[in-house]
Amino acid sequence: MNGNNNMNNNGKSNNKKKNKNWILGLVVVFLISAIFMSYFIRGGESYKNVPYSTFQSYLDNGLVESVVIIDKNLIQFVVKGSNFAKSYFSTSIPYLDINLLSELKNKKVELSSGKSQASLIGVLLQTLPWILFFIFFFFIFRQTQGGGGKVFTFGKSNAQKYEAGKNKITFKDVAGQEEVKQELREVVEFLKNPKKFEKIGAKIPKGVLLVGSPGTGKTLLAKAVAGEAGVSFFHMSGSDFVEMFVGVGASRVRDLFDNARKNSPCIIFIDELDAVGRSRGAGLGGGHDEREQTLNQLLVEMDGFGTHTNVIVMAATNRPDVLDSALLRPGRFDRQVTVSLPDIKEREAILNIHSLKTKLSKDINLQVIARATPGASGADLANLINEGALIAARNNQDEILMKDMEEARDKILMGVAKKSMTITDRQKLETAYHEAGHALLHYYLEHADPLHKVTIIPRGRALGVAFSLPREDRLSINKHQILDKIKICYGGYASEQINLGVTTAGVQNDLMQATSLAKKMVTEWGMGEEVGPIFLVDDEAPIFLPKEFSKAKAYSENTADKVDREVKRILEECLKEASDILLKHKDQLVKLAKELVLKETLTDKEVRELLGFEANKDEYDLFSSDSTTKEVKGEDVKG
């Protein structure tokens, strides 16, 4: 897509290198020439140092032609001879010779005073440090210009530019998101035919903010808009604006918008806008001045855009809550488009696109994969296909098999399996009882998600995992489902108490999940009986100040006590119910734990056959890269 740009950039960089090398060579030649000219202008003589007695001998014999007195202790003299046979000497006067001048006059020796005429080696030694210093400075200059520092061009925008017509990405390359694409087609139409809107007085939004979770395709959508409209596309990350130098961010904003105006119609796309567009606050010590200057300049530039400029500013963020309100007012990013996670049909379409360049086995059903990946983003699905391809290539296969996809699932969800990790029989039994407690509750709780797989093979920091798959895409969750989640979290804790008589440190993650859910029930979701339907979380604290530092709590100490009592009551009731179920079906719990010790990994189908449960009619044989992992038994800090 950027082949021509790269060729042009390479050509320019080569020309720059040639120019710099030519300049460096010219400077070196100039210095060498100056050295030799200095040497030859002085006569090119090379004076040989001799003892003072030798000088006296030449003088007594009348052979000294001329003498140059350098100082009171050093003279240079020339011995008579033919024009081609003169000898040049220098000597040091070891004592004060008061008769030397009169003797030179009597011998009619040409007498003068001057500075020492150094030899070529002496000249080189004197000038060499300057030459080395100049070369060192030159290379430092070249590195800062051509390398990552760019000291002398730090005020210039480093946005990636995609020329008009060379961006081949269109809406056809974006699977799903039909409502989002419909919203963005207005932008495309405006860039293609602005007079259509101007004729009736309509004003297209100056800024379009794409809001969504990471990996949902916000950047791809922005490129698709530029590709559909056939205009230039400037892409820059919000973090690229701000540097350590004061004023750099504002300068880069000005340069970016100047370039956009020169290349209109075009699109400016700022990724991760929250890196530069966070709410302006008091801060501590003024450490945010540079970022705020950059934000102010961005606001000014967007105000300076008129409809006649044919420049659209698009941005993406997954944190719209932290953006400065001035960015979101009409006239700036006044249109917000939410890019949501794909549903089952969209996931299948995304998988189809990413699998075009891979060789999938005929037994792989992309519809099944899509159904088994609720909550997965487009990036998750792309990573899933790629991991499966890597595993198949590692095994020297010609195509990707179902087992490769399953292995890729486990790797993405739980980390690399540590099959070589040494685990004692006692630790393996503890982990088996822990995971069996989680797994068994899935079959006796009405609102729990179906179990998919349970394993005691260590992966990452987890010694074992019991994870489930929702029956369908879930947009919300009710109170009964939340309570069952908490009970399943306590399944490992209760099982350890029942079968081992003591609990391990592996319950830490379970307790953390259970407590978090219970607190949200009471303080955010209005599910507490004593506190009632009230929202008790203060989310309006200044962005740059810790909440406990910036303002007091949003509720009284009396209310806080009620919240604590309510949370504790919910947790205790869930733990009791989980323990009662496991005690009632202890035989099945022990049987499942022993089978886990033996086989290490069991699927839902295998657990049902082992414990005599009815087969799951809705069972599907794949995984979710974003499945609801119920419980992860963490590392045992004891060793």
Curated annotation (Swiss-Prot):
Periplasmic topology ranges: 42-120
Predominant localisation class: membrane
Co-factor requirement: Zn(2+)
Tree of life domain: Bacteria
GO MF term set: ATP binding; ATP hydrolysis activity; ATP-dependent peptidase activity; metalloendopeptidase activity; zinc ion binding
Xref: PROSITE patterns: AAA (PS00674)
SMART domains recorded: AAA
Database matches in InterPro entries: AAA+_ATPase (IPR003593), AAA_lid_3 (IPR041569), ATPase_AAA_core (IPR003959), ATPase_AAA_CS (IPR003960), FtsH (IPR005936), P-loop_NTPase (IPR027417), Pept_M41_FtsH_extracell (IPR011546), Peptidase_M41 (IPR000642)
Subunit description: Homohexamer.
Protein name: ATP-dependent zinc metalloprotease FtsH
Gene expressing this chain: ftsH
